[in-house]
């Protein structure tokens, strides 16, 4: 199916060509000069919305840059594409699906139409069932097979069925029930499962198996290992229904596994895995923090959805961050984006955003199936501050690669232990200042540094950063933050003319692995028909495996 959204190829659009010319004019301008020319730049190039303060003044851009980027968004029919998504059009063209993760956080009573039906009542029916179940587990009403209270919840899932809940559990740990632990089994590596269950009691453990089809290889391998572990300790098939629930739509397989389908929580084809943490996939999150905090997170998601849908582009947080990112990706040739949260609880945010961004926009053909002639999604990486300052910040400051950075911080800490937070935030502010303005040779020389050491002590500066500041990390703020990045990724995908909601790139490796598994398990020497490298690796593995 072809797209009707972008009839003119991206690089032929007037705004793109104007941006290319504009880049040549300002590419060498230093942030020192931009701030010297405009003493109010720090206030002018900032946006306050939805509880966030975005300072984008330390970016290598001008008013004209922003104007041209906004025109590019208009030429890409961004407003039309936003409405198409929110209204349930099948904008995931390769899979012929609507993209309605925004419906997961729509308030009760809202109307979101998909294939002629309002999906909101069903969304809230699932949320209500989740809340009832979460309260039973948290309150001790739900008991294990031997009558003991559940002390640990293990989420079994991979990809979007793991990264979102894992990130959210850490992010909201301050709000969680500390007497109830949540762990995650994702990797098919048996060591992951072994460590997850290492010190657990089967009769105090609840497993949530997250797989829409209930056939996902990694998830079901871990689920069956968990089932065997429970049965070995409890000795009765009837125990499975007390220690397993499912997030799935395949009732037949769920029931076959031994799970009561009354404890199966569904979600829909219009929810992509990487956009599903606020669906039933978030059941472990709801159990950890409680329904009230989970619903507060949903309210945050929805508030950012409405901001994205209604705010003009120049006052729109996701659009502005998307356009700035595109400016570096497509004109400065930056290949990565560092996400640097200065909050311990957001330690897993970079890994979550890796999947969100790289699986969405890591595409080499456009929505019409044509090869792109420009760079698409960046590499996303990062680590919490101040840890990263003592590892990779050296390269950002003095290396040869341009690495735009998103700094995320909070004015109030959830754990006021003096003087920790002031020291943390002093580093937060200092890093963006140092990256922007650096340290000149004259400044270093004035400190009495020896001539031979001067080149090593100079900081070029002109390293671009966004600073995203909020009051404090709450469930609502987390929802807003994740929705901000969701819509940022969507905006960039629209301009690049991509289908940001499929992920065919993950399929080929899975298919090949399915062929190789019997070759590794076979008692007889298999006849291999791979390339010479893969054949040799398989034979070496089989020899070493036999010696174990």
Swiss-Prot record:
Pathway: Carbohydrate biosynthesis; gluconeogenesis; Carbohydrate degradation; glycolysis; D-glyceraldehyde 3-phosphate and glycerone phosphate from D-glucose: step 2/4
Keyword Oxidoreductase: no
Pfam families per UniProt: PGI (PF00342)
Group of enzyme by EC: isomerase
Catalytic activity reported: alpha-D-glucose 6-phosphate = beta-D-fructose 6-phosphate
Subcellular location: Cytoplasm
Gene Ontology cellular-component annotations: cytosol
Keywords noted in UniProt: Cytoplasm, Gluconeogenesis, Glycolysis, Isomerase
One function term, GO molecular function aspect: carbohydrate derivative binding
NCBIfam families: PRK00179.1
Family named by the database record: Belongs to the GPI family.
Name of the protein in question: Glucose-6-phosphate isomerase
Lineage of the species this protein comes from: Bacteria, Bacillati, Cyanobacteriota, Cyanophyceae, Gloeobacterales
């Amino acid at each position: 199916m072809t797209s009707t959204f972008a009839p003119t190829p991206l690089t032929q659009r007037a705004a793109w060509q104007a941006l290319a010319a504009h880049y040549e004019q300002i590419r060498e301008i230093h942030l020192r000069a931009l701030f010297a020319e405009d003493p109010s730049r720090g206030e002018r190039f900032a946006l306050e919305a939805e509880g966030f303060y975005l300072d984008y003044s330390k970016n290598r851009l001008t008013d004209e840059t922003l104007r041209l980027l906004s025109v590019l968004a208009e030429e890409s029919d961004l407003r039309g594409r936003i409405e198409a998504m929110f209204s349930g059009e099948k904008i995931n063209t390769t899979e012929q699906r609507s993209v309605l993760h925004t419906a997961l956080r729509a308030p009760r009573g809202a109307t979101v139409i998909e294939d002629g039906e309002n999906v909101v009542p069903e969304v809230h029916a699932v949320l209500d069932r989740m809340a009832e179940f979460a309260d039973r587990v948290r309150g001790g009403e739900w008991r294990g097979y031997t009558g003991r209270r559940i002390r640990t919840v293990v989420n079994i899932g991979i990809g979007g069925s793991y990264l979102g809940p894992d990130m959210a559990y850490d992010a909201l740990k301050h709000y969680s029930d500390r007497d109830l632990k949540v762990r995650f089994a994702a990797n098919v590596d048996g060591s992951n499962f072994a460590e997850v269950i290492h010190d657990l009691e089967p009769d105090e453990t609840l497993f949530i198996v997250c797989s829409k089809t209930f056939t996902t290889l990694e998830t079901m391998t871990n689920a069956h290992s968990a089932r065997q572990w429970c049965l070995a300790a409890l000795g009765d098939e009837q125990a499975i229904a007390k220690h397993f629930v499912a997030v799935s739509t395949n009732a037949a397989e769920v029931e076959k596994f031994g799970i009561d389908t009354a404890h199966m929580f569904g979600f829909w084809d219009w929810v992509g895995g990487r956009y599903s943490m606020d669906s039933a996939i978030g059941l472990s999150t709801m159990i950890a923090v409680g329904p009230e905090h989970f619903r507060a997170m949903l309210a945050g998601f929805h508030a950012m959805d409405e901001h994205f849908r209604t705010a003009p582009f120049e006052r729109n947080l996701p659009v502005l961050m998307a356009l700035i990112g595109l400016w570096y990706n497509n004109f400065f040739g930056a290949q990565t984006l560092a996400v640097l949260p200065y909050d311990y609880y957001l330690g897993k945010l970079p890994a979550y955003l890796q999947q969100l961004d790289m699986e969405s926009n890591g595409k080499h053909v456009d929505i019409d199936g044509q090869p792109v002639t420009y760079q698409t999604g960046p590499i996303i990486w990062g680590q919490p501050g101040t840890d990263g300052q003592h590892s990779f910040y050296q390269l950002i400051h003095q290396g040869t690669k341009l690495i735009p950075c998103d700094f995320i911080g909070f004015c109030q800490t959830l754990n006021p232990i003096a003087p920790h937070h002031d020291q943390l935030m002093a580093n937060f502010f200092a890093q963006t200042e140092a990256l922007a303005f650096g340290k000149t040779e004259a400044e270093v020389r004035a400190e009495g540094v020896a001539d031979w050491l001067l080149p090593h002590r100079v900081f070029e500066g002109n390293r671009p950063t966004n600073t995203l500041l909020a009051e404090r990390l709450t469930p609502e703020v987390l929802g807003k933050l994740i929705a901000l990045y969701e819509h940022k990724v969507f905006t960039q995908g629209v301009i690049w003319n991509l289908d940001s909601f499929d992920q065919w790139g993950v399929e080929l490796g899975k298919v090949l692995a399915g062929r190789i598994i019997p070759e590794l398990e076979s008692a007889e020497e298999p006849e291999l028909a791979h390339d010479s490298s893969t054949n040799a690796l398989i034979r070496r593995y089989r020899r070493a495996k036999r010696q174990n």
